[in-house]
């Protein structure tokens, strides 16, 4: 709103009233209570609009209903329009709803002008109480004001015309009342009908007056309902999104936990199978006969078919335990066949775990077909690590091919081999999807395990002591696995039950903590909700404090004035009472003197009575004699 409008209101009303304070914030959007206080203060100080409201309406506690507020403001607007003769576009319903602050300020400015020019509002009050509206009067006076000059003679003519109109209207009213009395005497039966007509007219007038406010009220109500509906919709959407997010988070956590358990079980089974294979391979045959060397050429087709069939079985079943059982059966049949088939089986198994199923299907066949030929010729692939290339070769083996220096890591080999199925990976790579926790508990055997198996198959029993050349890594791996197996075997059923109890207790604690977190979240949300109204209240407190301080200063000054007046009156009273006090003391002294005299007279009387008695007694005695 424009600041000039507020300034004009402060200038117009500030000369008339001192309370309530005409602050810019209140005048920018004046509430009904504030307007009620202004109007009642104007009536109390200036007498303008006196008699317009009842004693109940003068108290703001009784004007709380919307209709009562509208009628209160409508009366004031009608009186101001009749007295000032200027039109007012302010609507009571809009003012009560908090709209149109500029028009509300215009109403306050007109009230201030009427009070400053000391215009009488008695006639307007009577007309408004009789049910007249201020529109026609305002229009008539507006047209007359536009036509009349602004000098004093024009005003005098207007007042004279107004007086003549008054007299003529009074004469007309008198004649009309006389006619009305005659009609009443003649037509007493038509009274009820006329009353009904008057009532209907009054109702129609009230309806016309309150039609616009009702429309505005309905519009405001519809707007509020639409806003409330939009807020509810947004709130419901937000709640739905939150619930969906929580469900997704829960599913993610449960899936993560299940995946971890699956990976742990898989690693445990794999390690147990490896230990079993290692023990059986160590206890098996370590020597080779020349017949076995010769029979390798004849067994080539069988090896190829058996290896391809075994790999297809592994892929179709998908269980690693069956693969390990087949490997154990092959070891028991013959050391030569087991030595040729184990690397291919191991490689196909790890390719299934580490890579995608499609890569495993592509690589399984070539790996199973090519590896026996490589082992038959006793050729070491160039892709094997340096530790595997340093294995001592038996005397019956053919000369090794020239060594090719490769500086590629096992990780790059995994990336390169994903493209085709012809290359054979000589390094067993464990699943990379396992978590760091599983890596800390279980040590994966890769290249050293393959080198150990090849060493056991190719080297005679007398050369098994060369395992020490691998370093302490294999020994540490075996020791940790043995310790883990001992721990697994040493676990008693009671301890397992205890671990289950601990898990259930941990879950309960987790549920309790999640509930407490939920409660904390709810309390934080309620705190944030209550923070906004608290901030608004703090904004209004400043205004209330200023008003209270001004009122306190006013009462302090009034108290001081009354105390001074009391002291002056006290001094005047004391000065007036002092001579009276002196007279009173004198009178009291005189009273005391008179009482003393009375006492003395009484004493004389008593003495005289005694004398008289004695004389009478003596006379009596003398007469007897």
UniProtKB/Swiss-Prot annotation:
It is found in: Cytoplasm, Cytoskeleton; Cell projection, Cilium; Cytoplasm, Cytoskeleton, Cilium axoneme; Cytoplasm, Cytoskeleton, Cilium basal body. Disruption phenotype: Homozygous mutant mice are not viable and have neural development defects, abnormal neural tube patterning, polydactyly, cardiac edema, and variable microphthalmia. Mutant cells have a marked reduction in the number of cilia. Residues 472-600 form a coiled coil. Residues 130-439 are annotated as: Disordered. Residues 1-322 are annotated as: Abolishes microtubules binding when missing. Residues 229-625 are annotated as: DISC1-interaction domain. GO terms for biological process: cilium assembly; defense response to virus; embryonic camera-type eye development; embryonic digit morphogenesis; embryonic heart tube development; intraciliary anterograde transport; intraciliary transport; kidney development. Keywords: Cell projection, Cilium, Cilium biogenesis/degradation, Coiled coil, Cytoplasm, Cytoskeleton, Phosphoprotein. One of its GO terms (cellular component) is ciliary transition zone. Signal peptide: none annotated. Changing residue 453 to R: Decreased interaction with MAP4. No effect on interaction with IFT20. InterPro entries: TRAF3IP1 (IPR018799), TRAF3IP1_C (IPR041476), TRAF3IP1_N (IPR040468), TRAF3IP1_N_sf (IPR042576). Residues 153-327 have a biased composition (Basic and acidic residues). GO terms for molecular function: microtubule binding; signaling receptor binding; tubulin binding. The keyword Cytoplasm applies. Residues 141-152, 420-434 have a biased composition (Polar residues). The modification Phosphoserine is found at residues 316, 409. Interacts with IL13RA1. Binds to microtubules, TRAF3 and DISC1. Component of the IFT complex B, at least composed of IFT20, IFT22, IFT25, IFT27, IFT46, IFT52, TRAF3IP1/IFT54, IFT57, IFT74, IFT80, IFT81, and IFT88. Interacts with IFT88. Interacts with MAP4. Plays an inhibitory role on IL13 signaling by binding to IL13RA1. Involved in suppression of IL13-induced STAT6 phosphorylation, transcriptional activity and DNA-binding. Recruits TRAF3 and DISC1 to the microtubules. Involved in epithelial morphogenesis and in the regulation of microtubule cytoskeleton organization. Is a negative regulator of microtubule stability, acting through the control of MAP4 levels. Involved in ciliogenesis. Belongs to the TRAF3IP1 family. This is TRAF3-interacting protein 1. It comes from Mus musculus (Mouse). The gene is Traf3ip1.
């Amino acid at each position: 709103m424009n600041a000039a409008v507020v300034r004009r209101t402060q200038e117009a009303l500030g000369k008339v009233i001192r309370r309530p304070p005409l602050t810019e914030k209140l005048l920018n959007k004046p509430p009904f209570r504030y307007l009620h206080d202004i109007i009642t203060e104007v009536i109390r100080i200036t007498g303008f609009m006196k008699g317009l409201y009842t004693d109940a309406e003068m108290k703001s506690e009784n004007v709380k209903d919307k209709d009562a507020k509208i009628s209160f403001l409508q009366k004031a607007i009608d009186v101001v329009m009749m007295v000032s003769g200027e039109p007012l576009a302010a609507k009571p319903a809009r003012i009560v709803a908090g709209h149109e602050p500029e028009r509300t300020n215009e109403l306050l400015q007109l009230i201030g002008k009427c009070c400053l020019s000391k215009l009488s509002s008695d006639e307007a009050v009577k007309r408004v109480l009789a049910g007249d509206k201020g529109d026609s009067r305002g229009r008539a006076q507006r047209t007359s004001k536009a036509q009349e000059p602004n000098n004093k003679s024009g005003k005098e003519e207007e007042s004279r015309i107004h007086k003549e109109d008054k007299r003529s209207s009074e004469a007309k009213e008198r004649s009309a009342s006389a006619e009305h009395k005659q009609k009443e005497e003649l037509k007493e039966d038509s009274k009820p009908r006329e009353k009904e007509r008057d009532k209907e007219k009054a109702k129609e007038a009230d309806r016309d007056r309150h039609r616009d406010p009702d429309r505005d009220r309905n519009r405001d109500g519809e707007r509020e309902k639409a806003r409330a509906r939009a807020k509810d919709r947004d709130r419901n959407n937000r709640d739905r999104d939150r619930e969906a997010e929580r469900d997704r988070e829960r599913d993610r956590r449960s899936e993560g936990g299940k995946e971890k358990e699956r990976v742990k079980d898989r690693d445990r089974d794999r390690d147990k199978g490896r230990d079993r294979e290692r023990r059986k391979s160590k206890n098996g045959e370590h020597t080779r006969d020349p017949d076995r060397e010769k029979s390798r050429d004849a067994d080539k087709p069988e090896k190829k078919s058996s290896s391809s069939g075994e790999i297809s079985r592994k892929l179709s079943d998908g269980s690693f335990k069956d693969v390990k059982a087949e490997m154990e059966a092959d070891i028991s049949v013959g050391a030569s066949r087991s030595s040729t088939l184990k690397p291919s089986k191991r490689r196909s198994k790890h390719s299934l775990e580490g890579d995608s199923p499609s890569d495993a299907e592509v690589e399984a066949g070539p790996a199973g077909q090519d590896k026996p030929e490589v082992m038959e010729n006793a050729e070491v692939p160039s892709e094997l690590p340096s530790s595997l290339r340093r294995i001592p070769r038996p005397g019956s083996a053919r000369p090794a091919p020239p060594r090719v220096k490769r500086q590629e890591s096992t990780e790059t080999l995994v990336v390169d081999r994903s493209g085709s199925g012809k290359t054979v990976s000589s390094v067993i790579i464990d699943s990379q999807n396992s978590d760091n926790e599983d890596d800390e508990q279980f040590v994966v055997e890769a290249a050293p395990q393959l080198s150990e198996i090849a060493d056991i198959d190719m080297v005679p029993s007398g050369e098994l002591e060369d395992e020490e050349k691998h370093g302490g890594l294999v020994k540490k791996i075996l020791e940790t696995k043995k310790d883990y197996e001992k721990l697994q075997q040493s676990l008693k059923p009671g301890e397992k039950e205890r671990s289950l109890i601990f898990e259930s207790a941990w879950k309960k604690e987790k549920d309790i903590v999640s509930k407490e977190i939920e409660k904390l979240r709810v309390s934080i949300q309620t705190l944030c909700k209550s923070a906004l109204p608290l901030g608004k209240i703090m904004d209004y407190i400043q205004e209330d404090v200023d008003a209270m301080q001004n009122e306190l200063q006013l009462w302090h000054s009034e108290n001081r004035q009354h105390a001074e007046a009391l002291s002056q009156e006290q001094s005047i009273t004391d000065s007036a009472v002092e001579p009276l006090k002196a007279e009173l003391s004198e009178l009291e002294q005189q009273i005391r003197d008179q009482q003393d005299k009375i006492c003395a007279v009484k004493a004389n009387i008593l003495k005289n009575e005694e004398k008289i008695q004695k004389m009478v007694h003596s006379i009596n005695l003398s007469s007897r004699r």
